Amino acid sequence: MRICLNNAFGVDTSSIFDDEKNVICKNFKDKEKMRRAGCTAATILDRLCAFVRPGMNTHEIDEEGGSMMRDFGVKSACKGYRSGNRIFPSFTCLSVNDEVVHGIGLTDRVLQEGDVLSVDVCIRENGVIGDNCRTIPVGVVSSEVDRLLRITEESLYVGLREALHKKRVGDV
């Protein structure tokens, strides 16, 4: 199912899809709830990234993320997520180095100086989901890793500037 956010960002997206039968147009109240959930997730993400230090295990970081969610009065959209007979056990998704995405917080996964950590915070607030992710250096990283992180972030913003009304993913 696709969601059409008419004027959510000041852009009319009402005709973005050729097939309108699967489009749910959100009203202003729904869009504000989505924006608030995104902002809450972003705030938790900022604080959780600042918490990360070499020598911590990913379970500690995940537990801190769960604690922050409780402090904000929101729930994790990850923990307890069901896919078939599998249930996701963590509050956050924490992926180290070459792990792709949706890593689980583990007590035996200890962060080392120079690692790279992707932190994904996905929350439920007022019936909607806010989801933010960031990849950060753990302590001091090599110049190659620092360059990779910098260029990757710059590329994200270049892509966002090109993600315009009626453009296809291949155009971006």
Please provide the spans of the model-predicted regions.
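Active-site neighborhoods and metal-handling regions in enzymes and metal-associated proteins
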Residues: 1-172
